[in-house]
Swiss-Prot record:
Residues 39-107 form the KH type-2 domain. InterPro entries: KH_dom, KH_dom-like_a/b, KH_dom_type_2, KH_sf_prok-type, Ribosomal_S3_C_sf, Ribosomal_uS3_bac-typ, Ribosomal_uS3_C, Ribosomal_uS3_CS. PANTHER family: 30S/40S RIBOSOMAL PROTEIN S3 (PTHR11760), SMALL RIBOSOMAL SUBUNIT PROTEIN US3C (PTHR11760:SF19). It comes from the Bacteria. GO terms for biological process: translation. Belongs to the universal ribosomal protein uS3 family. It comes from Shewanella amazonensis (strain ATCC BAA-1098 / SB2B). Keywords: Ribonucleoprotein, Ribosomal protein, RNA-binding, rRNA-binding. One of its GO terms (molecular function) is rRNA binding. GO terms for cellular component: cytosolic small ribosomal subunit. This is Small ribosomal subunit protein uS3. Binds the lower part of the 30S subunit head. Binds mRNA in the 70S ribosome, positioning it for translation. The keyword Ribosomal protein applies. Part of the 30S ribosomal subunit. Forms a tight complex with proteins S10 and S14.
């Protein structure tokens, strides 16, 4: 049977950036890697309701910088930035180094595979019909500007005794094209009948000039300086 390679893994360094960007000596590498895992685990649990897509970790000069990509920055920041300060203190405690937390807003959550998968998972837990949840996610993504999307759910769908897999696709999702900007993510829905797995592929277009920018925030243009003496 044909198997699919992980769409993000095969594109690392081609069109996809890494989610941990640091260099370490042999003696520190394992500790840093485990620290990254613990920080991500803590933040994902703490920010479960904040629509977090991904967490990027950098380690400049014996410190840790965490960038949280979220569709609901207000939930992460909290009232007057109190929640961010609590998160910063916790991350510093886990990593054992001074921490800095940045928030990057996701402008179009309908095109983010992780947020789409989590949304479908939440709907299935609320007993929404799986076909309706899949179709709604696909229609929203295509309406916002996706060139293609595929959604796959597997498990005891609708409470059936025998588990099965169903999928729905619209547009094109070229998995073999390395320059294709394909966002892929998975999620789990814990229903009364058991766990249902969700996979989402979103094709946003082709990347023709190398790597994608990591942060989705638009750059502010600097005002032009007037020449002296005028």
């Amino acid at each position: 049977m044909g198997q699919k390679v992980h769409p993000n893994g095969i594109r690392l360094g081609i069109t996809k950036p890494w989610i941990s960007t640091w260099y370490a000596d042999k003696s520190d590498y394992a500790n840093n890697l485990h620290s990254d895992w613990e920080v991500r685990k803590f933040l994902e649990k703490k920010l479960e309701a904040a629509s977090v897509s991904k967490i990027v970790i950098e380690r400049p000069a014996k410190s840790i910088r965490v960038t949280i990509h979220t569709a609901r920055p207000g939930v992460v920041i909290g009232k007057k930035g109190e929640d961010v300060e609590v998160l910063r203190a916790e991350v510093a405690k886990i990593s054992g180094t001074p921490a800095q937390i940045n928030i990057a807003e996701i402008r179009k959550p309908e095109l983010d595979a992780k947020l789409v998968a989590d949304s479908i998972a939440q709907q299935l837990e609320r007993r929404v019909m799986f076909r309706r949840a899949m179709k709604r996610a696909v229609q929203n993504a295509m309406r916002i500007g996706a060139q293609g999307i595929k959604v796959e759910v597997s498990g005891r769908l609708g409470g059936a005794e025998i588990a099965r897999t169903e999928w729905y696709r619209e547009g094109r999702v070229p998995l073999h094209t390395l320059r294709a900007d394909i966002d892929y993510a998975t999620s789990e829905s814990h229903t009364t009948y058991g766990v249902i797995g969700i996979k989402v592929w979103v094709f946003k277009g082709e990347v023709l000039d190398g790597m994608l920018p990591q942060v989705e925030e638009p750059k502010q243009q600097q005002p032009k300086r007037k020449p002296r003496g005028k």
